[in-house]
Amino acid sequence: NLLQFNRMIKLETKKNAVPFYAFYGCYCGWGGQGQPKDATDRCCFEHDCCYGKLTKCNTKSDLYSYSSKYGFLLCGKGTWCEEQICECDRIAATCLRRSLDTYKLKYMFYLDSYCKGPSEKC
């Protein structure tokens, strides 16, 4: 669920999802359109795509099992949906960590009105 995703982001990046990622670029936070602005925004775009494939799952509310060992996030056993949601979140949190060196403050509270044009396909 979203709280677990927030904790994963915090474990990986040492930053809270709010405010650092909740309104970042065109894809971090709710929805999205246009082109991802940078590597961080691309992580969020890919996360949206990952969730988009899980149409039969409650991606924002289903609880799943995960742990952190030796600095790596590990998804635990659960229902198919729980495991898939966890993997989407784990991959995104890891992606956000890898993108920390290109994080731009100017995209932190980016206005949706700047996200124009066609969206990429997943």
UniProtKB/Swiss-Prot annotation:
Pfam families: Phospholip_A2_1. Its main location: secreted. Its cofactor is Ca(2+). It is found in: Secreted. It catalyses: a 1,2-diacyl-sn-glycero-3-phosphocholine + H2O = a 1-acyl-sn-glycero-3-phosphocholine + a fatty acid + H(+). It is an enzyme of class 3 (hydrolase). GO terms for molecular function: calcium ion binding; calcium-dependent phospholipase A2 activity; phospholipid binding; toxin activity. InterPro entries: PLipase_A2, PLipase_A2_Asp_AS, PLipase_A2_dom, PLipase_A2_dom_sf, PLipase_A2_His_AS. Nigroviriditoxin is a heterodimer of an acidic subunit A and a basic subunit B. Heterodimer A-B: Nigroviriditoxin possesses phospholipase A2 (PLA2) activity. It consists of a non-covalent association of a basic PLA2 subunit B with a non-enzymatic subunit A. Subunit B: Snake venom phospholipase A2 (PLA2) that induces myonecrosis in mice. PLA2 catalyzes the calcium-dependent hydrolysis of the 2-acyl groups in 3-sn-phosphoglycerides. This is Phospholipase A2 nigroviriditoxin basic subunit B. It comes from Bothriechis nigroviridis (Black-speckled palm pit viper). The lineage of its organism: Eukaryota, Metazoa, Chordata, Craniata, Vertebrata.
